[in-house]
Amino acid sequence: MVKLMEVYEGKAKKMIPIDDDKLIMEFKDDATAFDGTKKARFKGKGWLNAQLSVIFFKLLEEHGIKTHFIGVAGGNRLIVEKLDMYPLEVVVRNVVAGSLKKRLPLPEGYELPEPIVELYYKNDELHDPMINYYHAKVLGISLDEIKKIEEIALKVNEILKDYLAKKGIILVDFKLEFGKDKNGDIVLADEISPDTCRFWDAKTKRSLDKDVFRFDKGDLIEAYKEIYERITGEKPEF
């Protein structure tokens, strides 16, 4: 009997099983904001996010960070390792922006003296609430696992922040997801792209990420292209 493998489709990506160990991660051209209430499609967005994720995953692997990236299966498709995912979104913040403005009496653009790490329970029905170590324990995630996840997240931040600074880009904040591999090791998953990071131009503080779409600041594809061109020195191929 042929074993049917479930395809999972989210707002921005589609996960297509290859076998028991690998998946195709297909990046879509869809953009959403405000819990999916604002939607649009942008030709080339999926390609740009896929290619930028490849660059960042390779960079992190070079610095000893284990990621789920295996290879490229096409312009907007990556081959990734199948993991047992944690129901967490891990946010690292270097600069006050977004929802942090509502929780701290500090102005937007304030550079934090050290990074802030936040944990969110990944659940659409509950709108991804912020949680702490105690909540994580109830969800079956041990303190040791959380500490390891935070340690990796901070190392990722250090690597990406320094790399992007050389390209004239401020890494304001970003979201990461993690899973466990077959050996029980914690592995970085999902994507690293302008969809999941806040990037600002170092001189003008201009947004070069999904905030361009979220707050109608300009042309989303032009912003994503600019990130790609600054990092690679090349024009995108889509």
Swiss-Prot record:
Its EC number is 6.3.2.6. It is an enzyme of class 6 (ligase). Pathway: Purine metabolism; IMP biosynthesis via de novo pathway; 5-amino-1-(5-phospho-D-ribosyl)imidazole-4-carboxamide from 5-amino-1-(5-phospho-D-ribosyl)imidazole-4-carboxylate: step 1/2. CDD domains: SAICAR_synt_PurC (cd01415). It comes from the Archaea. GO terms for molecular function: ATP binding; phosphoribosylaminoimidazolesuccinocarboxamide synthase activity. It catalyses: 5-amino-1-(5-phospho-D-ribosyl)imidazole-4-carboxylate + L-aspartate + ATP = (2S)-2-[5-amino-1-(5-phospho-beta-D-ribosyl)imidazole-4-carboxamido]succinate + ADP + phosphate + 2 H(+). Transmembrane segments: none annotated. Coiled coil: none annotated. The keyword Manganese does not apply. Belongs to the SAICAR synthetase family. NCBIfam families: purC. This is Phosphoribosylaminoimidazole-succinocarboxamide synthase. It comes from Pyrococcus horikoshii (strain ATCC 700860 / DSM 12428 / JCM 9974 / NBRC 100139 / OT-3). The lineage of its organism: Archaea, Methanobacteriati, Methanobacteriota, Thermococci, Thermococcales. The gene is purC.
